Amino acid sequence: MDVRTERLNELFFVYHKNLKNQSKSKYSRAVNYLKRRGFNLQDFLKVGGGVGYLQNKEWLNLPLYSFDGNLIGFLNRKVSYKKEFLYTPFNKPPSKSEAFVGLRELVIKDNSIYLVEGDFDWLAFRKAGILNSLPLCGLTISNQQVQWLKQKKIKKIFICFDNDLAGKNGAKNLKEYLTKQGFITKVIEIKAAAKDWNDLFLLNNSNWSAVLTNQLLF
């Protein structure tokens, strides 16, 4: 293990421990933020989530793993009403094109996968038992990610982006690209007045599995 990987693994355990052993006096804003988005502490911990300070602010983070299973960095979400993301370490940011958030938690089913925009959309899918899902953390996919999906024998891809203009246009463009790459591709739009899948989850927290299953029917 090289020095960089060793240091990243050390950071992972520090961030994870910070969240696991959080108290009312420290990192409480991060825990309350998760609750406002419909998630409990275990939802975040079991996917390797953690919390730390960056730029004197609390940031939740998720590990970013390369295709060969190595930890290469973190996706950090600022604990704030305004969405703000950072990739760390700053001195050598990880290449998102050669990795996925949630790679270690992926359970491929029926050679199919659901691609969502954001990390919290992905967590919402997991809450409903949709474990063959990954967050793109954006609207595009890299050639390296496409090749990895092919290596994993993925045949069908369901694109589940946000319910805004950017999400709809992004889904359309991605469908065209993935179809040309040989995948069977379907865009699934949110059939409700919710801006994204996490918001839809918040509106239907008590019967989320049934609601999401119905949304994914086509």
Swiss-Prot record:
Q: Which domain of life is it from?
A: Bacteria
Record Gene3D superfamilies? 3.40.1360.10
Q: Where is the Toprim domain?
A: 111-193
InterPro entries named among the record's database cross-references? DNA_primase-rel, DnaG_primase, TOPRIM_DnaG_bac, TOPRIM_dom
Q: What SUPFAM superfamilies is this protein classified in?
A: DNA primase core
Q: Which Pfam families would you find in this protein's record?
A: Toprim_2
Under the heading PROSITE patterns, the entry gives:
TOPRIM (PS50880)
PANTHER family attached here? DNA PRIMASE
* Protein's name in the database: Uncharacterized protein MG010
Species lineage: Bacteria, Bacillati, Mycoplasmatota, Mycoplasmoidales, Mycoplasmoidaceae
